[in-house]
A protein has these predicted regions:
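Glycine-rich Rossmann-fold phosphate-binding loop(s) that bind the pyrophosphate
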Residues: 16-20, 40-41, 189-192
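Rossmann-like NAD(P)H-binding beta-loop-alpha module
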Residues: 178-206
Length: 206
């Protein structure tokens, strides 16, 4: 049987440093709550590193390439866009670096949030056990817990997929950044927002 602590180390513990976790921690800290944010990977989570930010940067470049090809729609002469795929991806990573300080440990620490790098495990409704990146353990009690751990791409068990090789919406940004040219062909599995954005962007980039 669980026993509610008589007093708490924190008002709020947030597990996950992505968009939802950062907003939760920010609002709580603004209300002068004692907040700890726990993140085991990159601050900013999916949105900054693999989702919203890089995809919108890619979409912008792809849109410009599309408009150059279809200049007559705007009363302009058309032409084939001349670009470097490597430079397009380099710009994407540059945009990530520009936005990253807004989601950084340093910024959230300055806002009054304690940021811990490590893995969290909830042991009861008020207790979180944290294995820090340096190998040490820390246990904190809290009045409330926000679980904002996000999700990962699902790789379907398709025959031959491992042999052919694939990227996910997480890994393509680093893998494609090493290419001088866009892949000659690309199959996108998944018709959700991420799949549609990537399919359109890479089609427009050739």
């Amino acid at each position: 049987k669980w026993h509610r602590p008589a007093k708490f180390d924190r008002n709020l513990i947030v597990i996950g440093g992505g968009a939802a976790g950062l907003v939760s921690a920010y609002i709580a800290a603004a209300l002068k709550a004692k907040v700890t944010l726990i993140e085991n990977h990159k601050m900013g989570g999916d949105c900054l590193n693999y989702g919203c930010v890089p995809s919108k940067a890619l979409i912008k470049s792809a849109k410009l390439a599309h408009q150059i090809r279809n200049g007559e729609h705007y009363g302009l002469n058309t032409g084939a866009p001349d670009f470097s795929f490597r430079k397009v991806l380099a710009r994407v990573h540059g945009v990530i670096r520009t936005v990253a300080p807004h989601d950084s440990v340093e910024r959230y620490t300055s806002l009054g949030v304690e940021v811990l790098q490590g893995y969290a495990r909830i042991t009861d409704p008020w207790t979180v056990e944290i294995k820090l990146d340096d190998g040490t353990m820390q246990t904190l009690t809290t009045r409330s817990i926000v679980i904002a751990t996000g999700a990962r791409p699902f790789v379907p068990p398709l025959p031959g997929l491992e042999e052919v090789g694939y990227v996910t919406s997480d890994t393509l940004w680093s893998t494609f950044a090493e290419l001088d040219e866009a892949p000659k062909s690309l199959v996108v599995l998944g018709g959700g927002p991420i799949g549609c954005e990537l399919a359109q962007s890479f089609a427009r980039l050739g």
